[in-house]
Amino acid sequence: MSIMQVEVVSSEQNIYSGEASFVVVPTVQGELGIYPRHEPIMSLVRPGALRLTVPGEDKEVLVAVSGGVLEVQPDKVTVLADVAVRSAEMDQARAEEAKKAAEAGISQAKDDKALAEAHKALAAAIAQLKTLDYIRSHKK
């Protein structure tokens, strides 16, 4: 089985570093499925669920990403995410509350910095909600 090295890093921490046999990344062009030996590309990441298939494990590793940059090399995938959260750390109620707070922050922003922070928080909340929806729709 072919494998590749995958790094998912946010501005706060290293979220995932290890091997994978398949990765799905939400990009601005749509979901991109990546196998080992993929052609080199770079793309912008959109909010959503990043999915990793780890060799020898029967379940996917899920990470909510709010945006960022994807770099693909034949033997390595790197995602530099604005915000990234492992699925085990997510909570539906907290994500919904964060989305409401971010939407309020956008409407009440007094300057560009506050508006940018509110948009960043909204993207993070949307990414978590999309990941939680994916988990719910794929339960066995």
UniProtKB/Swiss-Prot annotation:
It comes from the Bacteria. It is a peripheral membrane protein. It is found in: Cell inner membrane. Keywords: ATP synthesis, Cell inner membrane, Cell membrane, CF(1), Hydrogen ion transport, Ion transport, Membrane, Transport. CDD domains: F1-ATPase_delta. Belongs to the ATPase epsilon chain family. F-type ATPases have 2 components, CF(1) - the catalytic core - and CF(0) - the membrane proton channel. CF(1) has five subunits: alpha(3), beta(3), gamma(1), delta(1), epsilon(1). CF(0) has three main subunits: a, b and c. PANTHER family: ATP SYNTHASE DELTA/EPSILON CHAIN, ATP SYNTHASE EPSILON CHAIN, CHLOROPLASTIC. This is ATP synthase epsilon chain. It comes from Neisseria meningitidis serogroup C / serotype 2a (strain ATCC 700532 / DSM 15464 / FAM18). The gene is atpC.
